[in-house]
Amino acid sequence: DDLLLMMEDNIRQRHFGSAVRLEIDGDMPADVRDILMSNLQVDSYDVYTTNGPLGLSSLWELHRLERPDLKDRPFSPRTPASLQNLGGSVFAVLRQRDLLLHHPYDSFTPVVNLLEAAADDPDVLAIKITLYRVGSNPPVVQALKKARLNNKQVAAVVELKARFDEETNIHWAQELESVGVHVAYGLIGLKTHCKV
């Protein structure tokens, strides 16, 4: 709960936080730079001068142009052949051999299918999972809630420190707790995920 309270407070304070860097165009007059530094309380070592464009998010406007000849084909993650058109259970496949899914290259659908099957399977007693960037209306959360409502033991470590997704993760963590899922938030100062 301490970590949850700390993250909720950090989110509230985010809009009032101090500037951590100031990016300026190389042609900006020194007096304007000095006014900005003074008003934003930024030291000179936190000022970055660039001769390129500022605010790179505006480059998305180029992506919105209807020019398919200038774009890569949309990427579609693959589903391993052994998990396509399952006539039987996903558990039957897993009894035959282990599977390694490499996201985002492999589809996340088999993971959702596994959780949904586990939620309904009377032989499954518990589901334990770590959640990082949960997203909006996530089928994973729906499957975990269903499992809990089917009297399964469900435990989830929810990574609250998913930068700019904290509010979403807090919402879904509380939603899981509301149906009786045991939710842990990790440890202060320690992330529970990695990027490979």
Where in this protein do the model-derived segments appear?
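N-terminal localization/anchoring segments of enzymes in phospholipid and broader phosphate metabolism
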Residues: D1-V196
